[in-house]
């Protein structure tokens, strides 16, 4: 059973998440940040990972803590559910469009949590949501899932589309990488 439950509480946030890697993309997402809900629903749907999430935080200060911490907990949950990573594809990649936006994501559950992205110049708001929080979310996910993640924005000018396309391409890449195979651990070292 490739499932995990993580509860994380700090002075800034309280997050309770359950996942099933072998699900069908069923989700129950409850946070006080509408755009974060939308992104988590999209991640669940396109990764085929069932996600139950209840999260709250000091959004009166900023959305930053909550968004970053949800990414952290998602990464922790996936890492826990994968165990020693035996029998997974390890790698995943996608180039996905959303209207004018085109985003590439490449992912490796290598055991090394790293995140690289381009277009650091993109700034702005999606309703009350700061666009750059998408990068904080993915960075938290990458570090805690121990995955190397690359995101390249190939085209686009509407921030909502770029953000959503980034999350969907990440989800699609995760779906490929966690898919089962019967060749053991895909590493010449013998572990990930």
UniProtKB/Swiss-Prot annotation:
Places the protein is found: Cytoplasm
Superkingdom to which the source organism belongs: Bacteria
Keywords, alphabetical: Amino-acid biosynthesis, Cytoplasm, Histidine biosynthesis, Lyase
GO MF term (any one): imidazoleglycerol-phosphate dehydratase activity
InterPro entries hit by this protein: IGPD_sf (IPR038494), ImidazoleglycerolP_deHydtase (IPR000807), Ribosomal_Su5_D2-typ_SF (IPR020568)
Bilayer-spanning residue ranges: none
One GO term of the biological process aspect: L-histidine biosynthetic process
EC number of the protein: 4.2.1.19
Catalytic reaction(s) noted: D-erythro-1-(imidazol-4-yl)glycerol 3-phosphate = 3-(imidazol-4-yl)-2-oxopropyl phosphate + H2O
GO cellular component: cytoplasm
PANTHER family from the UniProt entry: IMIDAZOLEGLYCEROL-PHOSPHATE DEHYDRATASE, IMIDAZOLEGLYCEROL-PHOSPHATE DEHYDRATASE HIS7
Family: Belongs to the imidazoleglycerol-phosphate dehydratase family.
HAMAP family assigned: HisB
Name of the protein described by the UniProt record: Imidazoleglycerol-phosphate dehydratase
Gene (UniProt): hisB
């Amino acid at each position: 059973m490739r499932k995990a439950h993580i509860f994380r509480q700090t002075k800034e946030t309280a997050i309770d998440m359950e996942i099933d890697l072998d699900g069908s993309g069923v989700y129950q997402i409850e946070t006080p940040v509408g755009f974060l809900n939308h992104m988590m629903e999209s991640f669940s749907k396109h990764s085929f990972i069932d996600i139950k999430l209840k999260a709250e935080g000091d959004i009166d200060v900023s959305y930053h803590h909550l968004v970053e911490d949800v990414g952290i907990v998602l990464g922790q949950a996936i890492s826990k559910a994968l165990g020693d990573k035996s029998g997974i594809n390890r790698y995943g990649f996608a180039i996905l469009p959303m209207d004018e936006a085109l985003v590439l994501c490449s992912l490796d559950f290598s055991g090394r949590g790293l995140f690289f992205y381009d277009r650091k110049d993109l700034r702005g708001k999606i309703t009350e949501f700061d666009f750059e929080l998408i990068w904080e979310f993915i960075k938290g996910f990458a570090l805690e899932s121990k995955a190397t993640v690359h995101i390249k924005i190939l085209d686009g000018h509407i921030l909502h589309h770029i953000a959503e396309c980034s999350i969907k391409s990440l989800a699609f890449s995760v779906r490929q990488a966690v898919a089962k195979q019967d060749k053991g651990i895909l590493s010449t070292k013998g572990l990930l």
